[in-house]
Regions:
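Perimembrane helix-loop-helix junctions
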Residues: 210-227, 248-280
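Start-transfer (signal-anchor) and selected internal transmembrane alpha helices
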Residues: 1-37, 272-279, 425-428, 481-510
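Transmembrane helical bundles and short interhelical boundary loops of multi-pass, membrane-embedded
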Residues: 261-262, 267, 282-285, 294-309, ...
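Interfacial juxtamembrane loops and adjacent helix segments
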Residues: 63-142
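Transmembrane-helix motifs of polytopic, lipid-linked glycan transferases
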Residues: 147-170
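Membrane-interface helix-loop-helix junctions at transmembrane boundaries of multi-pass membrane enzymes
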Residues: 168-171, 224-227, 265-273, 352-373, ...
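Membrane-lumen/periplasm interface segments of multi-pass, membrane-embedded glycan/lipid transferases
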Residues: 268-277, 285-359, 458-479
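Short acidic/glycine- and proline-prone juxtamembrane loop motifs at membrane-interface regions
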Residues: 192-200
Length: 510
């Protein structure tokens, strides 16, 4: 009895903050900022997917006719022809779909004179992302693009970190690993881009984490913390829905995954389950209202040149490259920056290894949740292609963190997923090396074009920003920053601190 009282006293006694832990938090925070800056600098304006469209839409959202003039003429359904600043005109993407051509061609495009033709959003995407980013739009396009990329990065990382902090302490290490193994390279690239897909992915992932925590929350938590949790959960949904209409579908999938993982069928969770059901319905309604079926095609057009049966057959064969393309199987940029083979090899090793460890002792609830997410991940691209359209890996990226997170998390009453030091080191090291290779290739593609090789990015530079660190320094800082982030995740995985199991109440509320 005395031993039990002593143990209880230790649990209740406020814990002193370890100075080393506080220092690690500061170092990791700095590393995340540096990492975002490196990826923001890695590509020029126009380097992100459909950047001419998204940047024109942002500047047009300012309402300033001096930087954007609408014509009322449709280029295609819900895409309007507009006149924009010369720096946003056709020369912005002069290197698109030409991997051997550097971004130096932008200097040859006119930067003076009247407005130039482009295309902008007219209902194809929700307008929230463009209106928000237009707050940072100025006539200095290069500077504005960098500011917007850092804003996108900060918003994405902030959503993920806040959601992560609300999670049960026992889940934080698995969740950190889930993000590490599913968001490289495409996720981090999009977070620091002018494409709305980045913040949409972060919003969906943050919603899934907070939805799971919400279902686990018990009566011992304070009202303030409950409201804060719900606020973060709704923020993730709103950010995702105002960025992409198809995000509503993924919100619904994330709701189902969280509900199944937490055992939402239990009587005690029925009220909270209704909240998730309502959010899922809102998400589906948003997707249907946005008629996002036209959006899937993106820049790739339709498959009208192929017979429907042949297209579906090819889509089935290509499911891995579409579903897992975000891990390096697919190119970055405007689908014109192929990744080195080592990126896909190491990321598939890390993703598959973590997934297998997570399902080694899976419960029925976990298997059901995994089946739901993976079923959508496999079936969705086939269904979309069968409708005569195409799917890029970034459209399916929101499901990867949810899938990996579902595999790695456990209910409070179940044994947590454990990682040995060797396993953790192998997984983290693989991702760190893959990230370094992906960042190097991305910078190389725009500095000289991929027809030139070698480790030194500072040799024979054809394009770079007018100020700031050079291409080689940017890569070194970005690679080092990510290595620090990887070290933080490794420390979480091997910390060995066990959380007492005490029912289903989430300690994040205490």
């Amino acid at each position: 009895m005395a031993e039990e009282r002593s143990k209880a006293d230790r649990i209740r006694r406020p814990q002193r903050t370890d100075p080393r832990s506080a220092l690690l938090v500061v170092v990791c925070a700095i590393a995340l900022v540096v990492l975002g800056l490196a990826w923001s600098l890695a590509s020029p304006p126009g380097g992100s997917p459909d950047d001419d469209f998204h940047l024109a839409s942002i500047w047009c959202a300012t309402g300033d006719t001096g930087v954007c003039r609408r014509t009322g003429v449709e280029v295609r359904a819900r895409v309007e022809r507009v006149l924009v600043l010369p720096a946003l005109g056709p020369g912005l993407v002069c290197f698109a779909l030409q991997p051997e051509r550097s971004a130096a061609c932008q200097d040859e495009a006119p930067h003076e004179g009247g407005l130039k033709p482009s295309r902008a959003n007219d209902g194809l995407y929700p307008g929230g992302f463009y209106r928000f980013m237009s707050l940072f739009a100025t006539r200095n396009v290069d500077r504005s693009v960098l500011v917007m990329r850092m804003v996108s990065w900060t918003l994405s990382i902030a959503l993920l970190l806040v959601a992560w902090l609300f999670a049960r302490p026992a889940l934080r290490a698995p969740l950190a690993l889930a993000g590490l193994t599913s968001l490289v390279p495409l996720g981090v690239y999009l977070f620091a881009s002018n494409n709305p897909s980045g913040v949409a992915v972060a919003g969906i992932a943050a919603y899934w984490v907070t939805a799971l925590t919400f279902l686990e929350g018990g009566g011992e938590c304070s009202t303030t913390r409950k409201l804060a949790l719900v606020g973060v959960m709704l923020a993730g949904v709103v950010v995702a829905l105002v960025s992409r209409s198809d995000a509503g579908l993924y919100v619904a999938v994330a709701s189902v995954a969280a509900w199944l993982s937490a055992g939402g069928h239990r009587v005690a969770l029925r009220r909270r389950s209704l909240v998730l059901a309502a959010i899922a319905c809102v998400g589906i309604a948003a997707t249907l209202a946005g008629r996002e079926n036209e959006h899937w095609a993106g820049e790739l057009g339709t498959n009208e040149q192929q017979a429907r049966t042949a297209a579906v057959f090819e889509a089935i064969l290509d499911v891995p490259s579409r579903a897992l393309g975000a891990l390096g199987l697919g190119p970055l940029g405007a689908l014109d920056t192929p990744m080195p083979a080592i990126v896909a090899a190491l990321m598939l090793l890390a993703f598959g290894g973590a997934l297998l460890i997570g399902v080694a002792a899976a419960t029925r609830e976990k298997w059901l949740a995994l089946a739901a997410v993976s079923g959508i991940l496999v079936a969705l691209p086939v269904l979309v292609v069968s409708a005569g359209e195409n799917v890029q890996p970034r459209y399916l990226l929101p499901l990867l963190p949810v899938l990996m997170g579902t595999a790695l998390v456990s209910r409070p009453v179940d044994p947590p997923v454990r990682f040995g030091r060797g396993q953790a080191l192998l997984l983290v090291s693989a991702v760190v090396v893959a990230h370094g290779a992906a960042l190097h290739r991305t910078i190389r593609r725009y500095v000289t074009g991929v027809d030139q090789g070698g480790p030194d990015l500072g040799a024979s530079v054809e394009w770079w920003w007018g100020r700031g660190p050079g291409p080689m320094a940017t890569w070194a800082l970005g690679a080092l920053a990510f290595a620090v982030v990887g070290a933080c995740v490794y420390r979480l995985l091997v910390a060995g601190k066990e959380e007492p199991v005490s029912g289903s109440t989430s300690t994040a509320f205490r």
